[in-house]
Amino acid sequence: YHHVRSGKENNLKAIEALDKAIETDETNARAHALKACTIGGGYGKGYYEDPDKMMDMGLEHVKKSLEADENDFEVQRISSAIAQSNKEFNKSIEHAKKGHSINPNDPRILDRYGTCLVKLDNVDEGLKHLHLALSLDPIPQGAATSCSRYDALAIGYYCKEDFEKCISWGEKIQYMGASTWLTILYSISKNDDISKVKEHNIYKKYENDFKETNWEKTIHNMHFRPEDSKHTNLLEFSNKMFPNIKIVEKTA
């Protein structure tokens, strides 16, 4: 329950509950995988006092989950997500592909495999999986809206360079994340002109929410291959849209 709820308190309660499950059965592959997933989420949101220690713990639980049952699709799904966040891109695709082969109609693995493919390998194939995930399970477990599904499709169409569809899916999102907002702004600039971006409603709506964003870090955490144009184009665009203005104080 707690691992699909948002917030630091739920994150820590989820870890506590999963620890109890592991104490009961050390070979519980799903519990090890879910603990790794929970730690990965908390790490990304800055919940921990010693984040590196927690990430090492998460990686250890990924290893234990695979040793316990590599034929559990959830184990493969979570292993794929962790591998991609560690920039182990080929390993991420392998885990997602295996998870999909085990259970090809589960929306959780469809979302993971689709996300993996659009960012790293085969955009068209990935989009098929993302659309199927939306049709099978419009509001994912623990969510109140379809925002995460729309988010995945907006980024997927950015990866396809279908900028109109990136914008149209992005406009459906109620709770916008910084990375998706950036891909939508980039798409607006390609559909029109970069000088028109700040006139668009979606820019005005979220401008204040993301004015303190570290864009280099945000793009890094989207987990594209660093040499890929999907990554470098966003870096160049963010530098033009949000230049780092350094104020040099005059000395007497």
Residue ranges and their predicted role:
Residues 8, 94-111, 115-252:
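Alpha-helical protein-protein interaction modules
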Residues 1-109, 113-130, 136, 164-166, ...:
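Acidic, proline/glycine-rich low-complexity intrinsically disordered segments
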